[in-house]
């Protein structure tokens, strides 16, 4: 049986010239010459570039099938790897046999025809868009980043923990959660006071899709010392922007016996590790993004890796913004949550490097963040990156039960809803810290693709849950 080879392995020189192999993939283009030859560009998704197959007109099905091949048809090609006389490719496939696996019904109406399509159009055909150069490249980069994240944490001695997607806790205390229910909406059970009786629901209480795996992750960090979660999270935030998704993936490490400084160091090490990985492993895709999407993609990643992170207190960041002379769209004052324009000014113009902003006002941060000695700020941090702004948000967690209880009450939350979280402070509490990295936002940064809807396979946004 002939060896099956990926296009990536052939183009990387892992297949010897003169070897006969079988390539399975799809037609990107077909070009015919007057000399009785056809040139097929075949891709299989294993890398950015297709391989060229040279087809002689003496192949058995040349007239009946080869000359009918169009963009999108699937083929199985067996032939010999030969050196290519053409520029831009070291080798090509001299076809001996071609089987057509699948035809395109109507090439005239095929949504992924060889012409260039707008990114907006591609969202309407999300089931077919991975066949395009841009979305195929995004998918490979996404895979590379995910694998690098897992490798990084494994090498650092972390354990991956699967936290629940269905929860009764609101980690952020923002209330923007999707309710999970099996109740009949046309015949809802009611309490004596007329409220919906969730005790009759599937879980016996009000339940939601998770907004974060952090609280559950903390329980495992307080036993295994170093853990991380990596999975989907959900926000019922009615935001139609290029930065928001209703369903997205989060990376959330949690470290016991750790301070905010330890947290910031972990964030820096992780980001630099995964950026090195993508530069080493996906050069072909990054060159495409550099040429067609954002000319600074590769330079930005290299600069990030070679930069020392600046560190600054929130209060000092506010002073810098006030003294900048910039007319910001959102006015600056102590107590505001920094907007994207503020973050990008700090990272791109003032420091010209990644920045860790820390010790934020407690009133704009979540209940679980450790209260500082000044009583006004919490041990929170945001990592700001040139070109995007906030890329990571984290904190040292509040390990003191009495302080945590006070914060829960201040936020208008119910202590009984967090009984198990409070237990972590009652039984062998330790200082601990962690952060959250929005995985899709990381991909936006790495690829230069502007809209977050284009870096997740099937985006979920307000009034859009197609496919």
Curated annotation (Swiss-Prot):
UniProt subcellular location: Cytoplasm
Subunit comment: Homodimer.
Enzymatic reactions: tRNA(Asn) + L-asparagine + ATP = L-asparaginyl-tRNA(Asn) + AMP + diphosphate + H(+)
GO cellular component term of the entry, any: cytoplasm
Protein name: Asparagine--tRNA ligase
Stated family: Belongs to the class-II aminoacyl-tRNA synthetase family.
InterPro entries with a match to the protein in the record: Aa-tRNA-synt_II, aa-tRNA-synth_II, aa-tRNA-synth_II/BPL/LPL, Asn-tRNA-ligase, Asp/Asn-tRNA-synth_IIb, NA-bd_OB-fold, NA-bd_OB_tRNA
RNA-binding recorded as keyword: no
Taxon lineage: Bacteria, Pseudomonadati, Pseudomonadota, Gammaproteobacteria, Pasteurellales
GO BP annotations listed: asparaginyl-tRNA aminoacylation
Enzyme class (EC, first level): ligase
Pfam families to which the protein is assigned, alphabetical: tRNA-synt_2 (PF00152), tRNA_anti-codon (PF01336)
Recorded superkingdom: Bacteria
GO MF annotation terms: asparagine-tRNA ligase activity; ATP binding; nucleic acid binding
Keywords per UniProt: Aminoacyl-tRNA synthetase, ATP-binding, Cytoplasm, Ligase, Nucleotide-binding, Protein biosynthesis
């Amino acid at each position: 049986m002939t060896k099956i080879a990926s296009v990536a392995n052939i183009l990387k020189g892992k297949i010897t010239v003169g070897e006969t192999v079988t390539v399975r993939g799809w037609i990107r283009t077909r070009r015919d010459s007057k000399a009785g030859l056809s040139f097929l560009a075949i891709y299989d998704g294993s890398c950015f570039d297709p391989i060229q197959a040279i087809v002689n007109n003496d192949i058995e099905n040349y007239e009946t099938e080869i000359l009918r091949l169009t963009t999108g048809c699937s083929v199985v090609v067996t032939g010999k790897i030969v050196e290519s006389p053409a520029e831009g490719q070291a080798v090509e496939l001299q076809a001996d046999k071609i089987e057509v696996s699948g035809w395109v019904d109507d090439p005239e109406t095929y949504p992924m025809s060889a012409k260039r399509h707008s990114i907006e159009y591609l969202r309407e055909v999300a089931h077919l868009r991975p066949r395009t150069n841009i979305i195929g490249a995004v998918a490979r980069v996404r895979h590379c980043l995910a694998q690098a994240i897992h490798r990084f944490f494994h090498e650092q001695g972390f354990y991956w923990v699967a936290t629940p997607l269905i929860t009764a806790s609101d980690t952020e205390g923002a209330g923007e959660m999707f309710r999970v229910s099996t109740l009949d909406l046309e015949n809802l059970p009611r309490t004596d006071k007329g409220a919906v009786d969730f005790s009759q629901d599937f879980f016996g209480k009000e339940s939601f899709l998770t907004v974060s795996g952090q609280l559950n992750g903390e329980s495992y960090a307080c036993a295994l010392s170093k853990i991380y979660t990596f999975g989907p999270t959900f926000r019922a935030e009615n935001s139609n922007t290029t930065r928001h998704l209703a369903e997205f993936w989060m990376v959330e490490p949690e470290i016991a016996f750790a301070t905010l400084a330890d947290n910031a160091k972990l964030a820096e090490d992780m980001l630099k590790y995964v950026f090195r990985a993508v530069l080493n492993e996906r050069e072909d895709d990054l060159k495409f993004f550099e040429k067609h999407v954002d000319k600074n993609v590769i330079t930005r990643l290299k600069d990030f890796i070679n930069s020392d992170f600046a560190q600054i207190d929130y209060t000092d960041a506010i002073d810098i913004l006030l003294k900048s002379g910039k007319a910001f769209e959102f006015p600056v004052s102590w107590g505001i949550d920094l907007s994207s324009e503020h973050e990008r000014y700090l990272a791109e113009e003032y420091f010209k490097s990644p920045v860790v902003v820390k010790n934020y006002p407690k009133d704009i941060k979540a209940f679980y963040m450790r209260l500082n000695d000044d009583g006004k700020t919490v041990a929170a941090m945001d990592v700001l990156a040139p070109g995007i702004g906030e890329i990571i948000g984290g904190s040292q967690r509040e390990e003191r039960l009495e302080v945590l209880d006070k914060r829960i009450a201040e936020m208008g939350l119910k202590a009984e809803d967090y009984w198990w979280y409070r237990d972590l402070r009652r039984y062998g509490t330790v200082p601990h810290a962690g952060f959250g990295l929005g995985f899709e936002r990381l991909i936006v940064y790495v690829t230069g693709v502007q809209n977050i809807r284009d870096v997740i396979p099937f985006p979920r946004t307000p009034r859009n849950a197609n496919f």
